[in-house]
Amino acid sequence: MSAVIMQQGDLLLNLYIQPKASRDQIVGLHGDELKVAITAPPIDGKANAHLSKYLAKAFKVPKSDVHILKGELGRHKQVRISPPKNVPAEIATLLE
């Protein structure tokens, strides 16, 4: 399975999340997943909310267009962004 898949105009991301990082960033590939570091702690859904906000900003979409499909309670997540208005360079290279 690929870390980044374009599916009917939507972007499907298989992510590995690193909570409590020093800054928010897309780190790169981590096995067959895309590693994303976020500053929020994994407590009471704060990390998921922060991840959605960060991805919405990176892809220039409303937060309501970022859907966590799998992995609400773990570090391994599958996220759908429908449809992205912008694709960050780190992810665009993985789509080629």
Curated annotation (Swiss-Prot):
GO terms for cellular component: cytoplasm. This is UPF0235 protein Shewana3_1191. Belongs to the UPF0235 family. PANTHER family: UPF0235 PROTEIN C15ORF40. It comes from Shewanella sp. (strain ANA-3). Pfam families: DUF167 (PF02594).
